[in-house]
Curated annotation (Swiss-Prot):
Organism name: Gloeothece citriformis (strain PCC 7424) (Cyanothece sp. (strain PCC 7424))
InterPro entries: Ribosomal_uS11, Ribosomal_uS11_bac-type, Ribosomal_uS11_CS, Ribosomal_uS11_sf
Source organism, top-level taxon: Bacteria
PANTHER family per record: 40S RIBOSOMAL PROTEIN S14/30S RIBOSOMAL PROTEIN S11
UniProt key word Ribonucleoprotein: yes
Record family assignment: Belongs to the universal ribosomal protein uS11 family.
Function of the molecule: Located on the platform of the 30S subunit, it bridges several disparate RNA helices of the 16S rRNA. Forms part of the Shine-Dalgarno cleft in the 70S ribosome.
Protein name: Small ribosomal subunit protein uS11
Assigned GO CC terms: ribonucleoprotein complex; ribosome
A molecular-function term among this protein's GO annotations: rRNA binding
Keywords: Ribonucleoprotein, Ribosomal protein, RNA-binding, rRNA-binding
UniProt lineage: Bacteria, Bacillati, Cyanobacteriota, Cyanophyceae, Oscillatoriophycideae
NCBIfam families for this protein: PRK05309.1, uS11_bact
Length: 130
C-alpha cells in the first residue's frame, strides 16, 4: 500500500524586528518570559519549565535567568535590539530575569511593573503553618 506524500508545513520565516516588548510573569512557582513586537505578535517565549526545570526549582531566580536568556537569544535571532520590559507578579525571578535580558545584549528602554493589585477582590490563600 502506497504511503501518502507528506505535505510540508508553513516554515516560520525570520522577521526583522528591531524593537519590542518583553513581558515577564513571575509567580511563586514559575517564571514565563514572552517577547513580542510592538504590535503584540509574539516573537519568542520561554519559561522555567520549558528551560528544563521541574517542580520547586522552577520558582528559583536561576531558573528565571535561564528562561529569560533563552527567550532573548531567540528574539535576537529575529533581529531584536531594544525592548521595553513589563514585569508582573510577586515571584523570586523578577530582577534576575531583567538582568538576564540585559546581559544577553538587549537594550532595555523602559521597565514597568504591571502587577495587578486588587481593590479588595478575592480572598487570599490561608496562612502557611510550618
Amino acid at each position: 500500500m502506497a504511503r501518502p506524500t507528506k505535505k510540508g508545513g508553513a516554515k516560520k520565516q525570520k522577521k526583522n524586528v528591531p524593537n519590542g516588548i518583553a513581558h515577564i510573569q513571575s509567580t511563586f512557582n514559575n517564571t514565563i518570559v514572552t517577547i513580542a513586537d510592538t504590535r503584540g505578535d509574539v516573537i519568542s517565549w520561554a519559561s522555567a519549565g520549558s528551560s528544563g526545570f521541574k517542580g520547586a526549582k522552577k520558582g528559583t531566580p536561576f531558573a528565571a535567568q535561564t528562561a529569560a536568556d533563552n527567550a532573548a537569544r531567540r528574539a535576537m535571532e529575529q533581529g531584536m535590539r531594544q525592548i521595553e520590559v513589563m514585569v508582573s507578579g510577586p515571584g523570586a525571578g523578577r530582577e534576575t530575569a531583567i538582568r538576564a535580558l540585559q546581559g544577553a545584549g538587549l537594550e532595555i528602554t523602559l521597565i514597568r511593573d504591571v502587577t495587578p493589585i486588587p481593590h479588595n477582590g478575592c480572598r487570599p490563600p490561608k496562612r502557611r503553618r510550618v
